[in-house]
Amino acid sequence: MNKGAPTKDFDLVPGKWRINASLPGYKVVGCAIEDLRRRLFPLRQVEASEFVKLVPFDDTNGEPMEPPVVLRGLPKMYYYYGQTLYLWSVPLHAWRLKVDYAPHGPAGAPLTHQ
């Protein structure tokens, strides 16, 4: 997690894997799961090509379909699209998610990873 960057906490509901992580003027740059002892487990960001291999998409609306119940546990990666954050695997317990943000660049400027 970045020092000095805006951070937002989300209490995860077991079985819910979509989070509205919008913060006007900012983009998501990192996520971590916080356990009961307040230890942070960073999540790896994946690109669309890797996420599509794991999760089937609905042809009618283009949204990812809910994975089967068997595929639940401690999230290890996330996919960020628009203002929605998708966790993989689906959370099995009520952990806390910490999300780091960075300001968007000027309009039309390419986004850079730090």
Where are these regions (language model features)?
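Glycine-enriched, solvent-exposed interface loops adjoining structured elements
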Residues: 1-114
